[in-house]
Amino acid sequence: MHNGQHRRDLAISPGRALSTPQTQPRERADAARNRAQILAAAEHLFSTQDPAGITMDQLAKAAGVGRATLYRRFPDPAAVAVALLDEHEYRLQDQLLSGPPPLGPGAPPGDRLAAFYLAAIDLLEQHLPLALGAETGPARFTSGAYGFWRVHVRALLVEGGVPDPDAHIDLLLAPLAPELYDFQRNRMGLSSLRIAACVADLARRIMRQP
């Protein structure tokens, strides 16, 4: 999705192909090694500390690289979190485009929307600290991934004949906001299964499917 820049270049229209890691220019061995060290260190930091408090100095020290090396790749900790999320989000995007139903093509739109919710919640459950570090506040709406999700949900709404699909898109993506999921799981004590069942029910109600 990127070469260390702030956000990925994702397809945000059905006619464009995803830019996957396999299509990116090959890195030099030392650059690839540094990137791997940075991401491995960041994975640990984001999973053990408050993402909002992580600094570039901490990341550089944990990765065993110089500050200049870190800043050449990433402008801030949020960009590092984005890089860690990229691989997981690419896989979900690939499944939406060409995977088996109901996540991929071939199922009714309500079932596909429900499957998307379940997959996205699973992603949040596994990588919530990263999501909180990368996709909270206004940054969520400008991310390439959010643009991709918007196009996908809109296509399902149109297929399902939902009136005024453009007004529904962001309302339907709101349950997947990392801050909301964190509140539901860690403040309200809701299980991931309970949240998933609720949003799957919402998907089918919107599409008027039983």
Task: Annotate the PLM regions.
Residues 83, 94-126, 196:
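Hydrophobic alpha-helical connector segments
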Residues 1-49, 53-62, 79-82:
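Basic, helix-initiating cap at the start of DNA-binding domains
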Residues 131-143, 147, 157-206, 210:
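Hydrophobic/aromatic-rich alpha-helical bundle segments in the mid-to-C-terminal region
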Residues 64-74:
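Short hydrophobic/aromatic patch on the recognition helix
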